[in-house]
Design a protein with these regions (language model features):
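Short terminal or interdomain "cap/linker" segment that borders an active site or interface and mediates
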Residues: 4-5, 9-12, 17-20, 122-157, ...
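Short, mixed-charge aromatic SLiMs
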Residues: 42-50, 91-92, 182-193
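N-terminal leader/assembly segments
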Residues: 1-78
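Generic serine detector
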Residues: 8, 14-17, 22-23, 42, ...
Length: 194
């Protein structure tokens, strides 16, 4: 194990608005915005648009409404990963920017980020827990707990794209897969890189 779960983590309670804004942007880029907005409803859409104008913490209820509306689109796994890639690219500048710059200049590996994943995760989510288990020098499992967003296929699969893109900042290539969900509020990802 490289990064253990936080002892007795609290349930996820808020999500950084940049995640939702980036996810929404990914849906818009793929031509799904109109259908997404129908699923979301006008009152929630207005709250989300106002909330994502500036970086702030949004309630898990609002985040769940966003991801549930996106989940109802029933996008293919490939499309979900593409949306995750868009989110990752947009977050690179704000959340991972300093690490990305360090990696490009000093030969940092994915373990550099994975060893700090709890801190990086804490910049995106308040509550819940994330842990990293080392399987081999270029192989890990990332486990998410106490996060109700993990119950939504859209969030689980799109996160694969985000993780892959983030890993490829530090490696030539990466592969990320999500295991079938076993318990509510949890997700497990297998990540490998070259």
């Amino acid at each position: 194990m490289r990064v253990p779960h936080v002892p007795s983590p609290k349930q996820l309670r808020s999500v950084r608005s940049t995640l939702l804004a980036s996810s929404r942007h990914g849906l818009e880029e793929r031509g799904h915005l109109a259908t997404y907005l129908q699923r979301l409803g006008s009152a929630r859409d207005e709250r989300l648009r106002e909330a994502t104008m500036v970086t702030q913490w949004l309630s898990v209820d609002l985040a769940t409404a966003h991801y549930a509306a996106a989940d109802a689109l029933e996008l293919s796994e490939a499309e979900l990963r593409e949306v995750g890639n868009v989110v990752g690219a947009r977050l690179e500048g704000s959340l991972l920017g300093s690490l990305a710059r360090l990696a490009r200049t000093s030969g940092v590996t994915p373990w550099t980020v994975l060893q700090r994943l709890e801190r990086v995760w804490g910049r995106m989510y308040q509550g819940g827990s994330v842990a990293v288990f080392e399987l081999a020098p270029k192989d890990a499992v990332i486990e998410v707990r106490r996060n109700p967003l993990a119950d939504l296929r859209y969030w689980r699969v799109a996160l694969c794209g985000l993780m892959r893109g983030s890993t490829e900042i530090f490696a030539r290539s990466a592969h990320v897969s999500v295991e079938p969900q076993k318990l509510p509020g949890t997700a497990r990802y297998h990540i490998s890189w070259a």
